[in-house]
Design a protein with these regions (language model features):
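Active-site mouth of glycoside hydrolases
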Residues: 35-38, 44-197, 210, 220, ...
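Substrate-binding cleft/loops of secretory-pathway carbohydrate-active enzymes
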Residues: 181-213, 234-241, 281-288
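Short, surface-exposed loop/turn segments at beta-strand-coil junctions that are enriched for proline
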Residues: 395-401, 565-570
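Beta-rich carbohydrate-recognition modules and glycan-binding surfaces
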Residues: 428-599
């Protein structure tokens, strides 16, 4: 899981800390040593025993240090200079992430050119940051093995090659790689295929209390760090009749944080070197409240109190409110416009006043995102008719589909508690429009630009180009250096690299057009655009295919549409296709706001 990014994108974890410590020219790396003693494995930093009390996320480093933590983790290393300086100024170390590509984002570990480029990027990261005094470990990859068996030897070779290079460049900081849990070939991959990896980083949620036992049973001997742990994962909780999971309350989650830390971290002396709790900040994943230890407005939840006590030995003087699971009066499956009542029980440990906010949102329906960015579903305005500390009354929307009612309970000190309950409006569900293929970046979009065709070695694709987007913060830049007579194409696929051998796709029934904005660098570039690519000869075809050919772009942004009426849009696995013809000296085009609409 974690804060993932696409292969071409970088993760910037910004700090809210305002006090920076410019790295002096005379600053030196603090040596970190991994030592095996009679009692087991031990980490030494600056010659002194060092147990990692850390967190991952983009929340305040000042609050993290004040809570008793001593370390922070990043998933990538782009533009982390300020974060390293801020961490060092606060006495925090940093496990610096070296992002490795994911196959589901289009990275191909059998492509030697991609692997070489990735290794060189890792080299530059190490050379840039190895002497910074905040650096603790190198985190080489995060769940790059994927969510299957995790036993692809080509991936493990790439990991080990990078780790071996890192050790030569920087003998002062140990190497770690991070896997999604321990199943399949993950233990053997790290233990047997990666001799240059010193530490096994483990992302585990429901399995955190038993991780030490399972790790030993799998034959592992290297030390481990819990690199992500938190509440039960969305995949670990049963779903209701329409496929929605019941999210634990913030109070129940806090209790599970404690259990995981006491069993999987401090309960495994000599094997566990510490941990990084997830997520120190706010994160939309499955729901807006599932994984974050803070709300979007900065309010601290009960998990912060628990970790403060576990790190520092003392709980905060003011604790977050507690909340019991919400209770629906009547049915949870309702007709459009029905009224429903929900009961709540909230307690403030100090006996103070509580104020509440009730919010109804459409359910995201995306529960297995692997940490990829997703936008927060909008609030359904006017749905909550009455909201109190002991319950709420609401009127369900007219649009059929799944929804979720959220309770946010605050005390006067900026602490909060959350609970929610899924609800369903009966009737035929239609995909909300507009439905974006691209909006301000590749990350978090339904389809991945993974289907490269033609002279792909001559193409560069940038989904975060900030120069003159049509709207928002970024647009797509395609730069092709092929000669006249050559061509290149990119298909947006779901899931990534789906050439018809996988299930997937989206039901876009009701969409009338695919709409996009495009321009050319010189106003002479020619493109073809389309929806759908996979024919009936494939095991899992697109339900429709259509193209618009020989579009000559202009230098200014122009809107283009593909008519979709009367097409079967029930299963679109290839959301968008663009091909670009070569020209002298090169061809550069820009695309923005690619979306399905209903007119």
């Amino acid at each position: 899981m974690g804060l993932l990014k696409t292969t071409a994108q970088a993760l910037l974890l910004s700090s809210t800390c305002l006090v920076l410590w410019p790295l002096a020219a005379s600053a030196k790396a603090i040596p970190v040593e991994l030592r095996q003693t009679e009692q087991g494995w031990q980490l030494l930093r600056g010659g002194k025993p060092y147990f990692i009390r850390g967190a991952g996320g983009d929340g305040s480093l000042e609050l993290l240090a004040a809570a008793g933590a001593n370390s922070v983790r990043t998933w990538g290393a782009d533009d982390i200079d300020a974060r390293l300086d801020a961490a060092h100024a606060l006495g925090l170390s940093v496990t610096v992430g070296i992002w490795l590509g994911h196959e589901r984002h289009g990275f191909d570990y059998s492509d030697e050119a991609q692997v070489r480029k990735q290794l060189e990027a890792a080299r530059q990261t190490v050379l840039r940051y190895k002497d910074h005094p905040a650096v603790l470990l190198w985190g080489i990859g995060n769940e790059m093995e994927g969510f299957g068996e995790g036993d692809n030897p080509v991936i493990w070779k790439a990991v080990n090659d990078i780790a071996a290079m890192v050790k030569k460049l920087d003998p002062l900081h140990p190497t770690m790689t991070v896997t999604a849990e321990l199943g399949g070939g993950r233990i053997d991959g790290v233990q047997k295929l990666c001799p240059a990896i010193d530490i096994h980083g483990i992302n585990t949620y429901g399995g955190a209390p038993s991780v030490a036992e399972r790790y030993r049973a799998g034959g592992a001997t290297k030390p481990y760090v819990l690199t992500e742990f938190g509440p039960l994962g969305v995949w670990e909780i049963p779903k209701n009749d329409w496929g929605a999971p019941s999210e634990p309350t913030s109070t129940d989650k806090a209790a599970f944080y404690r259990r995981s830390y006491e069993s999987g971290v401090i309960g495994a002396p000599g094997l566990a070197l510490g941990s990084y709790v997830f997520n120190w900040g706010f994160k939309m994943e499955a729901t807006p409240t599932w994984y974050g230890m803070f709300l979007a407005d900065g309010a601290r939840l009960g998990a912060v109190d628990v970790m403060t006590e576990l790190w520092s030995g003392s709980p905060p003087t003011n604790l977050a409110p507690t909340v019991e699971p919400l209770v629906i009066e009547g049915e949870s499956q309702l007709d459009p416009g029905d009224e429903v009542r929900v009961r709540a029980v909230i307690t403030d440990p100090e006996g103070g006043a509580i104020h509440v906010r009730w919010v109804l949102r459409r359910e995201s329906g995306e529960y297995a995102t692997g940490g990829d960015f997703r936008p927060v579903p909008p609030e359904v305005e006017g749905a909550v008719l009455e909201g109190r500390a002991n319950g709420a009354r609401l009127r369900m929307p007219r649009d059929p589909g799944p929804y979720r009612l959220f309770l946010y309970a605050y005390d006067a000190a900026g602490r909060a508690a959350t609970a929610n309950v899924p609800l369903l409006v009966k009737g035929q569900v239609r995909t909300p429009m507009p439905f974006y293929v691209y909006q301000d970046g590749f990350e978090g979009m339904p389809w991945a630009p993974s289907g490269w065709m033609g002279s792909t070695d001559l193409l560069t694709l940038d989904g975060d180009h900030a120069g003159n987007p049509h709207e928002g913060k970024a647009c797509i830049k395609m730069h092709f250096v092929g000669e006249v007579g050559t061509w290149v194409g990119v298909a947006w696929q779901h899931p990534a690299n789906n050439w018809g051998d996988q299930e997937g796709g989206y039901d876009l029934t009701g969409a009338t057009h695919l709409e996009l904005w495009a321009r050319g660098e010189f106003g002479v570039e020619k493109i073809n655009i389309g929806v759908g690519l996979l024919g009936q000869d494939k095991a899992h075809p697109d339900s429709a295919k259509t193209t618009v050919e020989d579009i000559r772009l202009k230098k200014d942004w122009q809107r283009y549409r593909i008519r979709l009426k009367k097409l079967d849009l029930s299963s679109i696995k290839t959301g968008f296709v663009v091909t670009l013809s070569g020209r002298r000296p090169d061809a550069t085009i820009y695309l923005d706001s690619i979306r399905f609409i209903r007119k």
